[in-house]
């Protein structure tokens, strides 16, 4: 929730306490009918979620990257979509959702984040009052994601769709625990406009409409996403592999490392420009 800081309100008005009270009501006192979550609300949200799941395929870039994670992490929580699958959502009943709700608010890990000018004691008091009815019966340990195992042979999956632009996504397991080094390496490899993927695969050779890489810190793996012409599949894959090999062999120039460090430093400094970025940073630690 976001509100105007009290310092900018006229006549000494305060919004912190009313806002935390609304949050407390939403979480601790949802609309119930005969002891269960409102069937009408559950049905409405179930329909909305199924619509979102069905429409996910329309955004091919995101869909392809999501499918890569599903295949790489099949059978793991990391491989599941954050909006679930249609069959599971369709099976949700008000009774089952109510039971899950009670379990979640009683046992799930609870973290409260505040960014603003208010004194910490005032913030703590506001949240304690707002969440005074929150039942707690012991927490459930937060399961840590396990590093992705290295495959002995590459797994290749092709899906045919009626599209004008192909999507080529590649995933790699990272065989090192030096995550800071991997962050720098990934930045040089494909995370910025100065990266090897962008400058070579996209700009120099024109094999991709876009090409970028992402480091999944929790799973210690790197994924590459690219948009290609169908006939360029093998050429693009070979060149992506060649750029990764160049990184592995230390084939880069000093300016590439300098640019990566500068990009990462600027990114860290910019976190303080946004309350939401600060929240994401701390929650991700």
Task: Enumerate the language-model features and the residues they cover.
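Charge-rich, well-structured scaffold segments of protease-associated domains
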Residues: 1-139, 203-285
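His/Glu-based metal-binding/catalytic segments typifying zinc-dependent metallopeptidases
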Residues: 109, 137-198
